[in-house]
Amino acid sequence: KVLLILRLVHKFDMLQPHFYTNLVEAGCDEAGRGCLAGSVYAAAVILPRDYNNPALNDSKQLSHKRRNELREQIMHDAVAWAVGVVTPEEIDRINILKASFLAMHRALDALNVRPEAVIVDGNRFVPYGDLPYTAIVKGDGKYQSIAAASILAKTFRDDYMCDLARRYPYYDWEHNMGYPTKKHREG
């Protein structure tokens, strides 16, 4: 009985379609900010006004397989999407927080549709031109466009780390994706 009730509650605990009701909004999120290695990736996603995909969620809550399935759906269904990247060399020069914002700005720059507003996962953001923006703590678990951006940023970064793992197999990046692990702490 309890499991059934939890499933029903979860079924109706869907992400919100939009923060700004009358503006074309882009959701943004990053992946790689807490990593020891690799670039930081960010995605910007504009979803259709009437879009509803109950499977969308924070990428960290989804399996690798499910993230990749949703990635294909997002890329197909989105009005516009783009990914921005900041290299390790740039991160070393400007710091990881500024690099995260720069990656988001690069993703927004690459959109083929200009948003009228931006919503971002987190507690702060560097303004993007004159667009209104809102930073939303745990936004990837609250708004569909941020969740979609979370999924794209994570999957594109994972692909990049798997490519690095093929070139540098001794770091185990295909499994840890550059994040610190117990193995790192023991090493």
Predicted regions and their residues:
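RNase H-like, Mg2+-dependent phosphodiesterase core
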Residues: 4-187
